[in-house]
Amino acid sequence: MGKNVVVLGTQWGDEGKGKIVDLLTEQAKYVVRYQGGHNAGHTLVINGDKTVLHLIPSGILRDNVKCIIGNGVVLAPDALMKEINMLKERGIPVEERLLISEACPLILPFHSALDIAREKARGNKAIGTTGRGIGPAYEDKISRRGLRVGDLFNAELFAEKLKEVMAYHNFMLTEYYKVDAVDYEQTLSDALALADYLKSMCVDVTELLDNARKAGEPILFEGAQGTLLDIDHGTYPFVTSSNTTAGGVATGSGFGPRHLDYVLGIMKAYTTRVGAGPFPTELLCEVGDHLGTKGHEFGATTGRKRRPGWLDAVAMRRAVQINSVSGFCLTKLDVLDGLKEVKICVGYQHPDGTISKVTPLAAEGYEQVTPVYETMPGWSESTFGATFLEQLPQAAINYIKRIEELLETPIDIISTGPDRNETMILVSPFN
């Protein structure tokens, strides 16, 4: 029987999920996105050729894989078309490989307009969203006024629903945020123009995945963002608007949770964060500059510079608990090459002097703690491109083993470079 594997980020996103999903899809028949939208940025490097995907699952470059956008994903038709056209220009037969749930909420121009207006109004209290309308689209879904992909297939009803929801949002844009309204006729025309094309790719995702499971076909679920950005379990309110954790797989795809076999947590050998929000182990020093420069830490979606810091084992321990992580993939180990010492945060010191090994409830709690570090020797040798554990310097192996001890979870895969083949798979999630 085939295994059903979840790949998700355990930090604040940007852990290197895209590369690992692409690598593992060699053994998968289906790759499923189950949450988020085109705020994700998954970078694949194959034989030096770089591809950045925001909405389409990372298995799209494999000719043996069907890629599915599940109901938990908020879908911007214009962003999807841009990505499809980019791939088609490179000779990828997207229509043969991509399938979409009719239940995906739509992101429309007024969602992006609201997102941008809100961030501007917040001033120095901005959340740091991508401005792509993700949050407002999820709000409409929860408020039961959102439009979904399937609504496009009844033009008259879609027009009626769109008029109602746009009247509401345009009032907010013009009267509260004092910005221009979004044009209804243009929004309607642009959306309906893609209706037939999108309909040709729509399927009953729950039925499809359940049949695949019964047939023993391996399925890979691809998470976006990271655990610490989860709407419920992250550094609230500096979070995304979806459940980025393993529990989101079932709700965002319609796949039964009892049938998930393995959860692979992707974790950098250090930590980064994009945008605003608390970050206990952030390094505002030369070491931070080293990590940011050597790790090419710029967001794949926004281009924003990422904030680097040491690995936070306290936060990673919570990620293990929330996600039932079976094993980790440690990425960007090579970025630590050349450092005299490396540190791991093993506790949080609170203002009253007490030390805890659990994460606070929300952002305010994170902002009050000071990291307690364990220091280990660094290594001068290069780990870049290593494909066998024996090729690593002993100090790097010791660092890996210490992480495993602290998290009580094995590191099953180690990434030592951006390319597909710069990876050592110690234990395959599908085996």
UniProtKB/Swiss-Prot annotation:
User: Quick one: where is this thing mainly located?
Assistant: cytoplasm
Its top-level enzyme class, in one word, is ligase
Q: Which reaction does it catalyse?
A: IMP + L-aspartate + GTP = N(6)-(1,2-dicarboxyethyl)-AMP + GDP + phosphate + 2 H(+)
- BP-aspect Gene Ontology terms: 'de novo' AMP biosynthetic process; IMP metabolic process
How is the cofactor bound, in the record's words? Binds 1 Mg(2+) ion per subunit.
Domain of life per record: Bacteria
Q: Which cofactor does it need?
A: Mg(2+)
**Sequence intervals crossing the membrane:** none
SUPFAM superfamilies attached here?
Answer: P-loop containing nucleoside triphosphate hydrolases
Give the EC number(s) listed in the UniProt record: 6.3.4.4
* Gene Ontology MF terms: adenylosuccinate synthase activity; GTP binding; magnesium ion binding
Cited SMART domains: Adenylsucc_synt
Quote the subcellular location field of this record.
Cytoplasm
Please name the catalytic residues of this protein: D14 (proton acceptor), H42 (proton donor)
Alphabetic keyword roster: Cytoplasm, GTP-binding, Ligase, Magnesium, Metal-binding, Nucleotide-binding, Purine biosynthesis
Q: Where does substrate bind?
A: A300, T301, T302, G303, R304, K305, R306
Q: How does it assemble?
A: Homodimer.
Family, similarity comment: Belongs to the adenylosuccinate synthetase family.
Stated role = Plays an important role in the de novo pathway of purine nucleotide biosynthesis. Catalyzes the first committed step in the biosynthesis of AMP from IMP.
* Protein name, entry field: Adenylosuccinate synthetase
Gene for this protein? Answer: purA
